[in-house]
Protein backbone atom coordinates (compact mmCIF):
# COMPACT_ATOMS: atom_id res chain seq x y z
CA UNK A 1 0.00 0.00 0.00
CA UNK A 2 1.34 3.41 -0.92
CA UNK A 3 1.13 6.12 1.71
CA UNK A 4 1.57 9.84 1.40
CA UNK A 5 4.85 11.32 2.61
CA UNK A 6 4.78 12.80 6.07
CA UNK A 7 4.84 16.56 5.91
CA UNK A 8 4.73 18.98 8.78
CA UNK A 9 1.52 20.94 8.84
CA UNK A 10 1.15 24.20 10.65
CA UNK A 11 -1.64 26.69 11.12
CA UNK A 12 -4.05 28.37 8.76
CA UNK A 13 -3.28 27.86 5.07
CA UNK A 14 -0.69 25.14 5.82
CA UNK A 15 -2.07 22.73 3.24
CA UNK A 16 -1.44 25.23 0.46
CA UNK A 17 1.92 25.95 -1.17
CA UNK A 18 3.98 28.61 0.65
CA UNK A 19 2.47 32.07 0.33
CA UNK A 20 4.16 34.57 -1.96
CA UNK A 21 4.86 38.09 -0.69
CA UNK A 22 1.87 39.32 -2.68
CA UNK A 23 -0.43 36.75 -1.06
CA UNK A 24 0.94 37.61 2.39
CA UNK A 25 0.24 41.27 1.65
CA UNK A 26 -3.37 40.45 0.75
CA UNK A 27 -3.87 38.54 4.01
CA UNK A 28 -2.39 41.42 6.00
CA UNK A 29 -4.54 43.90 4.06
CA UNK A 30 -7.61 41.93 5.16
CA UNK A 31 -6.46 42.02 8.80
CA UNK A 32 -5.90 45.78 8.74
CA UNK A 33 -9.20 46.39 6.93
CA UNK A 34 -11.11 44.34 9.53
CA UNK A 35 -9.52 46.31 12.36
CA UNK A 36 -7.41 43.48 13.78
CA UNK A 37 -4.18 44.43 15.51
CA UNK A 38 -1.30 42.72 13.67
CA UNK A 39 1.76 41.31 15.40
CA UNK A 40 4.76 39.33 14.21
CA UNK A 41 5.97 36.31 16.21
CA UNK A 42 8.82 33.86 15.76
CA UNK A 43 9.91 30.53 17.22
CA UNK A 44 12.60 27.94 16.53
CA UNK A 45 10.14 25.06 16.83
CA UNK A 46 6.72 24.68 15.26
CA UNK A 47 5.46 21.83 17.41
CA UNK A 48 1.70 21.95 17.85
CA UNK A 49 2.09 21.82 21.62
CA UNK A 50 4.13 25.04 21.60
CA UNK A 51 1.61 27.63 22.73
CA UNK A 52 3.95 30.56 23.32
CA UNK A 53 5.95 32.20 20.54
CA UNK A 54 8.32 35.13 21.00
CA UNK A 55 6.83 38.41 19.87
CA UNK A 56 8.87 40.51 17.45
CA UNK A 57 8.73 43.99 18.99
CA UNK A 58 5.29 45.16 20.14
CA UNK A 59 1.99 44.59 18.33
CA UNK A 60 1.42 47.16 15.60
CA UNK A 61 -1.47 48.92 17.35
CA UNK A 62 -1.62 51.85 14.94
CA UNK A 63 -0.79 50.05 11.69
CA UNK A 64 -2.78 51.58 8.87
CA UNK A 65 -1.02 50.05 5.88
CA UNK A 66 0.12 46.66 4.73
CA UNK A 67 3.63 47.98 4.12
CA UNK A 68 4.18 48.74 7.81
CA UNK A 69 3.49 45.13 8.75
CA UNK A 70 5.44 43.69 5.80
CA UNK A 71 8.42 45.83 6.82
CA UNK A 72 8.40 44.21 10.26
CA UNK A 73 8.09 40.74 8.68
CA UNK A 74 11.13 41.46 6.49
CA UNK A 75 13.16 42.68 9.47
CA UNK A 76 12.24 39.58 11.45
CA UNK A 77 13.17 37.31 8.51
CA UNK A 78 16.57 39.02 8.30
CA UNK A 79 17.22 38.76 12.03
CA UNK A 80 15.92 35.18 12.49
CA UNK A 81 16.30 33.26 9.20
CA UNK A 82 16.32 29.87 11.00
CA UNK A 83 13.02 30.41 12.81
CA UNK A 84 9.38 30.03 11.91
CA UNK A 85 7.72 33.42 11.58
CA UNK A 86 4.00 34.04 11.74
CA UNK A 87 1.67 37.00 11.59
CA UNK A 88 -1.21 37.08 14.04
CA UNK A 89 -4.22 39.37 14.20
CA UNK A 90 -5.81 40.25 17.53
CA UNK A 91 -9.44 41.32 17.79
CA UNK A 92 -9.62 43.96 20.51
CA UNK A 93 -13.42 43.67 20.76
CA UNK A 94 -13.54 39.91 21.36
CA UNK A 95 -10.13 40.08 23.09
CA UNK A 96 -8.71 37.09 21.30
CA UNK A 97 -6.43 36.09 18.47
CA UNK A 98 -8.55 35.86 15.32
CA UNK A 99 -6.04 35.27 12.52
CA UNK A 100 -2.71 33.46 12.46
CA UNK A 101 -0.61 32.20 9.58
CA UNK A 102 3.02 31.31 8.94
CA UNK A 103 4.91 33.62 6.60
CA UNK A 104 8.38 32.04 6.81
CA UNK A 105 9.67 28.51 7.34
CA UNK A 106 13.37 27.73 7.81
CA UNK A 107 15.16 26.05 4.91
CA UNK A 108 15.52 22.83 6.88
CA UNK A 109 11.84 21.95 6.18
Curated annotation (Swiss-Prot):
Mind listing the UniProt keywords for this protein, alphabetically? Bacterial microcompartment, Calvin cycle, Carbon dioxide fixation, Carboxysome, Photorespiration, Photosynthesis
Task: Identify the InterPro entries for this entry.
Answer: RuBisCO_ssu, RuBisCO_ssu_dom, RuBisCO_ssu_sf
Q: Name one GO molecular function term.
A: ribulose-bisphosphate carboxylase activity
According to its UniProt entry, the function of this protein is described as: RuBisCO catalyzes two reactions: the carboxylation of D-ribulose 1,5-bisphosphate, the primary event in carbon dioxide fixation, as well as the oxidative fragmentation of the pentose substrate in the photorespiration process. Both reactions occur simultaneously and in competition at the same active site. Although the small subunit is not catalytic it is essential for maximal activity.
Give the protein family: Belongs to the RuBisCO small chain family.
What assembly does the database describe for this protein?
Answer: Heterohexadecamer of 8 large and 8 small subunits.
- Its recorded name reads Ribulose bisphosphate carboxylase small subunit
Q: Which organism is it from?
A: Prochlorothrix hollandica
Amino acid sequence: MKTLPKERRYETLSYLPPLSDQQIARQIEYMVREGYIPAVEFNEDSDATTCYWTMWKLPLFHATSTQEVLGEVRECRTEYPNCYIRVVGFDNIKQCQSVSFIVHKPNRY
